[in-house]
């Protein structure tokens, strides 16, 4: 993975799909247990990585850790990620922001559960598999604390409040990141899906500077960054490329050739077969050939995986096909990998 980031030769491309609900299902545990007990999450991640020969284990599980530790109510479900109630945000009135205290990631709350997960993963697979930590981006966390509808209106009506809220969020997320880094993660993801709902001008003016601040400080902590903005982020690609992150997840609605063109040659790109169409409803051959097309569109510095999370009911053979494609890119005298059926592909040059 790190050689891909720097453009160095690799023996094969890494396979790094995001497995959350799929990992819980693979391990035979309910998702509530997965997100509330770091030991369950770690066991499921290690089992899934071993069963499918993945090149990553991840602490990403749900978007409710930071806001929950701030005091936000959480809705819990047995077999899907928890969520905040948009009808009951923590910051109902703007003045509520002034009453919030920075949560301590070591205080025993949901953030600390992730930190302990990082330490346990380091103990179990450190040095063998890269460990992906996770924090929320400024817009995503603002939606968790304030509510999506309210923060979207705030962007227009009260940018000064948005700046204050984003400043609070960045401090909180960087404290959370520091704790995960100290516990042993190798790379950190920033999830900011809500940013894809914002137009390019507002994004550039209000969101991009805070994402940039996060990336710069994470780099000062000597931690590579993986940016995850799912949805259609086509209108944000140029700015996303300017952030200087090592890796970007590109979701299915985005044209990969355009992503490479606008973000430049130096960032690693993961994606972007549609998780439902290919992994849940497709065949292993569909997955393999879809990834070959994605690889051809991205070119160098490609990381193998779907555009977003692996659906929990995906057939195991389809997830194996993701890894099969990554393994087929091993350096050989032949310029093209074997197709999943075992025949040389004629149209998917590496």
Where do the PLM segments sit?
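A cross-taxon signal for low-complexity, glycine/charged-rich
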Residues: 341-345
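Glycine-rich, N-terminal phosphate-binding loop and its surrounding beta-alpha-beta segment
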Residues: 45-75
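Loop-to-helix transition at the N-terminal end of transmembrane alpha-helices
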Residues: 39-42
């Amino acid at each position: 993975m790190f050689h891909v980031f720097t453009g160095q030769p690799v023996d094969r491309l890494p396979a790094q799909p995001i497995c959350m609900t799929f990992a819980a299902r693979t391990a035979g545990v309910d998702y509530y247990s997965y997100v509330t007990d770091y030991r369950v999450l770690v066991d499921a991640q290690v089992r899934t990585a071993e069963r499918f020969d993945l090149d990553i284990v991840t602490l990403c599980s749900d978007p409710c850790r930071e806001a929950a530790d701030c005091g936000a109510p959480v809705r819990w479900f047995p077999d899907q990620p928890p969520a905040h109630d948009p009808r009951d945000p923590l910051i109902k009135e703007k003045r509520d922001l002034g009453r919030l205290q920075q949560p301590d990631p070591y205080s025993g709350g949901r953030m600390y559960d992730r930190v302990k997960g990082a330490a346990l993963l380091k103990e179990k697979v450190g040095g063998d598999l890269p460990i992906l930590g996770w924090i929320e981006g400024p817009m995503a966390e603002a939606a968790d604390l304030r509510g999506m509808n309210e923060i979207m209106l705030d962007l227009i009506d009260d940018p000064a409040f948005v700046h204050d809220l984003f400043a609070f969020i960045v401090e909180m997320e960087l404290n959370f990141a520091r704790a995960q880094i100290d516990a042993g993660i190798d790379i950190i993801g920033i999830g900011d899906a809500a940013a894809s709902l914002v137009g390019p001008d507002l994004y550039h003016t209000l969101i991009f500077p805070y994402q940039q601040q996060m990336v710069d400080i994470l780099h000062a902590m000597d931690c590579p960054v993986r940016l995850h903005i799912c949805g259609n982020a086509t209108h944000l690609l140029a700015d996303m490329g300017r952030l200087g992150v090592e890796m970007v997840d590109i979701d299915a609605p985005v044209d990969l050739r355009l992503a490479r063109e606008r973000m430049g040659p130096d960032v690693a790109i993961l994606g972007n077969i549609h998780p439902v169409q290919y992994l849940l409803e497709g065949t292993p051959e569909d997955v393999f050939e879809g990834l070959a097309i994605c690889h051809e569109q991205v070119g160098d510095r490609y990381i193998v995986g779907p555009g977003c999370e692996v659906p929990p009911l995906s057939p195991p053979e389809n997830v194996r096909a993701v890894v099969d494609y990554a393994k087929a890119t091993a350096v050989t005298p032949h310029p093209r990998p074997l197709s999943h059926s075992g025949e040389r592909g004629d149209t998917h040059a590496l």
